């Protein structure tokens, strides 16, 4: 393994001063809430994947911990300047994290959370032990690509390499190239990028004649299981990674994929100031549903230079949020009826506000951030960290603080309130908000 030296990565984070108000106080409050949440994890779930705040118990995804929260949260600590907490988390990771476990893991989830988190933290710290862990994980995930099409199976056993789960979706197949490509760049081993790029290309070439994809496909046969197209969970980050692959790796094919894909999405899925569902083959509208996961799209549109569309859609997302004082998982945008009432501490609407502020410097996106933050504190804060909501209508609490709350939700709020912490145009965020260098 030959690592490139990116140890000065943190130096590019400090820049300029904010142009309005007192961003330091807002960002410091977010930092305080991060610490509040992290200390709850330390007290009740240390060494485990996630915290259940109400029951004060840990949760492990697969029966044995892969340190999801520490790995996911480490680069947030580094960005926030929480050096003591970062050192403690990094020590836990390098001393205790092992992937030599008989666990069938979801390739997508461990890639965006663990591989992405290890790579970004390595780039920030220069600690080669983090890159070694990333390379070990990458090697253990490679057997997932051994399908007849080259599109990865949904699960792989970390110890045996046995892959399973032939029915997958575009997001799980196409949201690997940033992490695997970065691993190739840092280790000078092209196999990771090649496997992920081939999978993305195989999926893309199965788009319909009008340029849309469905939301379920068999990776062994290459046949679509569901022809429903949308921009929500199951398809979302497939689109996002086409754009970001083109930007991060200057990849012509990825750029072309994004241009053609987003053109089809805008033509057939856009519905006024919303994006709905349609049949991938005919473009016929099949549903008028939109939700928390769909709210990634304004960020992608802004990054892709389609600012007007991005701004209109973020305004729609904000209306969805304000209707109940926090966003539901899914609504019918024609009736504004809640279809799925939970709130999972998701970051996407905040991510989009951050991207739009960086793209326009319009203070209203910071004002949106204040609404998001105030509502989070009002409805999701517990005596021990933050938790999901079972219903945004009744505000009944769930009992989980997902690792992405520390990796994404609070990170994007912090960066929205204090752009000095990171130079936006020098990094590309993976879909778990782990910044990777150009």
Regions found by a protein language model. Give the residues of each.
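Glycan-recognition and catalytic cores of secretory/periplasmic carbohydrate-active enzymes
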Residues: 20-438
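Bacterial N-terminal signal peptides
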Residues: 7-16
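Positively charged n-region of N-terminal signal peptides that target proteins for export
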Residues: 1-5
């Amino acid at each position: 393994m030959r690592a490139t030296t990116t140890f000065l990565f943190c130096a590019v984070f400090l820049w300029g001063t904010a142009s309005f108000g007192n961003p330091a106080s807002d960002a410091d409050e977010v930092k305080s809430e991060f610490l509040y949440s992290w200390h709850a994890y330390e007290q009740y779930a240390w060494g485990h994947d996630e915290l259940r705040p109400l029951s004060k118990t840990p949760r492990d995804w697969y029966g044995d911990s892969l340190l999801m929260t520490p790995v996911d949260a480490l680069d947030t600590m580094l960005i926030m300047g929480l050096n003591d907490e970062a050192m403690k988390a990094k020590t836990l990771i390098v001393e205790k994290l092992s992937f030599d476990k008989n666990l069938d893991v979801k390739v997508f989830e461990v890639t965006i959370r663990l591989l992405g988190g290890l790579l970004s933290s390595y780039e920030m710290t220069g600690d080669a032990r983090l890159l070694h862990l990333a390379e070990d994980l990458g090697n253990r995930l490679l057997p997932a690509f051994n399908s007849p099409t080259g599109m990865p199976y949904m699960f792989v056993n970390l110890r045996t390499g046995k892959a399973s789960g032939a029915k997958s979706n575009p997001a799980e197949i196409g949201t690997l190239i940033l992490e695997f490509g970065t691993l190739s760049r840092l280790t000078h081993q092209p196999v990771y990028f090649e496997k992920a790029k081939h999978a993305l290309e195989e999926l893309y070439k199965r788009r319909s004649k009008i340029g849309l994809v469905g939301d379920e496909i068999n990776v062994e046969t290459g046949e679509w299981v569901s022809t429903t197209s949308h921009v929500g969970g199951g398809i979302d980050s497939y689109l996002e990674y086409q754009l970001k692959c083109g930007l991060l790796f200057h990849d012509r094919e990825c750029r072309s994929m994004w241009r053609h894909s987003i053109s089809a999405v805008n033509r057939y899925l856009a519905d006024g100031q919303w994006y709905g569902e349609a049949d991938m083959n005919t473009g016929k509208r099949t549903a008028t549903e939109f939700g928390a996961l769909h709210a990634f799209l304004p960020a992608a549109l802004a990054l892709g230079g389609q600012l007007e569309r991005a701004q209109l859609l973020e305004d729609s997302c904000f209306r969805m949020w304000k209707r109940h004082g926090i966003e539901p998982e899914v609504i019918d945008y024609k009736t504004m009826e809640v279809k799925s009432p939970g709130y999972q501490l998701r970051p996407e609407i905040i991510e989009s506000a951050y991207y739009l502020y960086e793209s326009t410097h319009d203070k209203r996106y910071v004002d949106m951030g204040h609404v998001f933050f105030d509502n989070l504190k009002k409805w999701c804060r517990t005596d021990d960290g933050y938790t999901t909501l079972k219903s945004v209508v009744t505000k009944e609490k769930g009992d989980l603080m997902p690792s992405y709350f520390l990796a994404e939700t609070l990170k994007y709020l912090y960066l929205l309130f204090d752009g000095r912490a990171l130079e936006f145009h020098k990094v590309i965020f993976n879909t778990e908000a782990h910044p990777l260098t150009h």
